[in-house]
Amino acid sequence: MSIKRLTKEDLRETTGVLNPVGHTVLAFKDDAVTTTAATALHGVGMAAEDVLVYAGSEALPRLRERVATASGSAGFGYEITLMRRYLALAEAGAGWLIVYTPEDAAAERVTEVATRLGALCAVRYHRLANEDLI
């Protein structure tokens, strides 16, 4: 079964905790480093539609909303823990990438760029689990 490549519109339309299966969520210290990371990902073969870029100011309100509206049962799981972690990073000015990584080879390229550019987090979402890449 193939995994759908998400768009910004897809993500805007989802509610509750973030769970972009087949994608990796990355945070960088600011928007400038995030832009550099997006360029680096394109340089290692990631297509433009595979890399969604979010400025800190774009991500912060949505993360606040997601944390505030997460269901009660989500409050005890790893997903809401990640959302709270993401919110803290966004409040500190982090920029964000959501990268399509359905295959291990793509995740390896993302991990290399994330490590080289000092990503604050890199979490790959699978169907049944999440994986910290750095």
Enumerate the language-model features and the residues they cover.
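Positively charged, small/polar-rich N-terminal and surface patches that mediate targeting and assembly
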Residues: 1-134
